[in-house]
Amino acid sequence: MPQNHRLQFSVEESICFQKGQEVSELLSISLDPDIRVQEVNDYVSIIGSLELTGEYNIDQNKHTEEIYTDKRFVEQVRKREDGSAELTHCFPVDITIPKNKVSHLQDVFVFIDAFDYQLTDSRILTIQADLAIEGLLDDTQDKEPEIPLYEAPAAFREEELSEPPAHSVVEEPGASSAEEAVLQHEPPAEPPELFISKAGLREELETEKAESEPPESVASEPEAREDVKEEEESEELAVPETEVRAESETEESEPEPDPSEIEIQEIVKAKKETAEPAAAIADVREEADSPAETELREHVGAEESPALEAELHSETVIAKEKEETTVSPNHEYALRQEAQNEEAAQSDQADPALCQEEAEPDEALESVSEAALSIEDSRETASAVYMENDNADLHFHFNQKTSSEEASQEELPEPAYRTFLPEQEEEDSFYSAPKLLEEEEQEEESFEIEVRKTPSAEEPKEETPFQSFQLPESSETERKETDAVPRVAPAAETKEPQTKESDNSLYLTKLFTKEADEFSRMKICIVQQEDTIERLCERYEITSQQLIRMNSLALDDELKAGQILYIPQYKNSHA
């Protein structure tokens, strides 16, 4: 059985005192181990420290200024009143021992076998100690010889000891003869077939090469055959030579690329490379040129549009003035009387609604056609009379007419009926209600319609935006004339869509009624964060259908903060 073994090793450490803690005389010193033994996996760990304690007198006369950077300073020094001090310092210990060298942890313990110190300087203390560990197993003892499972007899062992030299001599010729036999039997086994196949392959490759090459290669065929014979005679060099030549011939048999094809490929690559930068440059030029072109086009369009509008407006005004001046006062009076009679006849009818739908459109169209014919006749008859009038008389007559219209507006509160010219519709479209709303209201309220004129920027003080007015009875025939004038207006006005003509004809049928629509004005509302369609309808006292129709909304649309809505307001505008 193994006995306890003792492991011993030396420890030497130096510590340094700081300035003001120099040692003049060392009174006592001791070194005690503080060790614990624990098992960690397959090892036994000895962890702890060697605690150094002592007392000494402080050297107050000597104050060195040397700085020791490579030394370890004393951890704790406590000074006393009598000029002495106590020092305490710990040297860490960490030792690991294999587990198979420890029988029991309780048997392992550490102690200080020998201890000495040396004070080389008043600030440097050197400690020398021999540390011993007991309780370990001794591996240096002689191991017991292993007993073999089978032991040969003594006579046989003696023969083995005596025969090995003779046996070794006999084996050498046997080994050489075996090697010779292998060498003799190996060549005739496979090489003949290999040589034949290689030679046949070589001949086939050479024939193919001869067919593809010019006639000069035919002269080389006998030489190739002689080479084949020489290769068959030399067995050892035949295989590598045939392999090398076969590889070289296969490389030669591969068609070489024509120089023309290589040049074509290079030209195509160069074109591709040059095409990409050219396309990029063209894109950049287009992007650079496009802003200038768009600005020029916008500038030209902005300059042309006011000129065209001014020309069209001037043509329509001149045509109106000519038509108004060519009509005689007596003829105007007659036309007014006829219009009054027609209105009286229409008012006496039993059912105004049915007459509106059935009879009034036909009568209105007939009256309009009669008015247009009468205007043309009067123009022909009165043209000779009024051709001698000056421009001053024309302007005077026109101004007198407009003044009479303004006077009639102040006297009678009944609503007036006026037609919109294309230029007026374009100018007032921003301030007026949407066209969709006007068309729907005209279809729903088929009995009456009110056309209100919003003030332009030039005359904000003359008319109020929501004032209803009516011209005297004598102005109705003039309205008929102005309604009929667009039918014989210049070519710029006759090019309007067919839908506008149908709206104008429907408007003329409604023109002769004495009732007005209840539509008055509208407001603009900015939607807040918590507003909904129902809340806005309750706030402005309108129905949700009116709000949805006015703003072209859907039934399931949700309002967003900052959205602008048009709020219609209705009031009774009957005279």
Swiss-Prot record:
Residues 229-238, 249-264, 438-448 have a biased composition (Acidic residues). Residues 200-212, 266-275, 283-302, 310-325, 449-464, 493-502 have a biased composition (Basic and acidic residues). One of its GO terms (biological process) is sporulation resulting in formation of a cellular spore. Residues 465-474 have a biased composition (Polar residues). Keywords: Sporulation. The keyword Transferase does not apply. Residues 159-502 are annotated as: Disordered. SUPFAM superfamilies: LysM domain. CDD domains: LysM (cd00118). It holds the Pfam family SPOCS_spoVID-N. InterPro entries: LysM_dom, LysM_dom_sf, SPOCS_spoVID_N. Residues 523-567 form the LysM domain. One of its GO terms (molecular function) is lytic endotransglycosylase activity. Required for assembly of a normal spore coat. May be a component of the innermost layer of the spore coat that aids in its adherence to the prespore. This is Stage VI sporulation protein D. It comes from Bacillus subtilis (strain 168). The gene is spoVID.
